[in-house]
């Protein structure tokens, strides 16, 4: 008689869920400091790099930033080791990642404009290359750790919770401790060293609490050029990219602008941070509770419109506390919507691709999305610095001494382009097709297909499928 193998429900241990989520937040924490406006502020305000040269750095960096994600994804997918395809990059890349981060804040001697330009460019190139290697591996680890959506979802819940920390630190802590021109930066630099060592330690140690299952790809994928073509002939994906580019641009620009805003605009910070926090929590509760009723499309249109109105409120009335509090409240709704709704919309876009091609191609879409949206980070930095230069911002002045024109430049550079882009998204989303009864029927059919594929695959590995 043939022996029957007992099937068990797939389960991701609690410590594994916490470890990968903490590693994800730690990796993002360093990126939010070095890869955002914090490093730009440090180089232009404290070290004295000309804002126009800093803008050129970000433009050059943007070219590399657009292609290194798909390039590393290609290399990572073909890595073979006893630890797996992803863990070696996370574990052994973490110490080098820390060194690259710390090097960003070293005040090297003879800081001429040319030297500062090269320093910032090399720091960004080295840091982001290591960030890509580690962050990409962490991003796909939930898919290496579990097969079933039910098991994976237990990881994603914790990732959302931990994502609050890399968002909050640049917005709240950095404006308090960052040095202005002529001020002593020793404490600030040691704080950054501590961040680099601490976050890298979390990333490194996390790899001992989870492991890859080494599942092989079950479906034959399309050739590269055909796969690329299928992405760009998927109309919902094009509309999604307009939104995705905008969200990356806006989040980068707003987190950069707040550093300059509190330096020069005489508005109390605490009430604004409270309004932002209330907006984040309130927006998350709102969208979680209303998503089923409104759907992703309507929720996204509401979010982009409110986010846009918040930008224009700060643009017009950013020197006054109450309207700025309203604007920050709308910023919070926008940030929470970006964290919660964008991944759901991305999932619908991939579902539509599966409906068209019969294949599940999250990896290809992630690579193409990075290729399109990564330049948004550089664009946000460069455009903000361009506005500062045009309005006469003087990087040599101490905090609070800029002219009225420079203050206006901060408000314009901080909120004008984000507000316009978000309103454009509100309009473009009118033509987003993945909504309504027909789309729900397609989703229902795909759900049945997924369940059958998942059942067969899990049972072939000895796991019991659970609804």
Q: What is the predicted function of each stretch?
A:
Residues 2-467:
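Membrane-embedded alpha-helical bundles of multi-pass transporters/translocases
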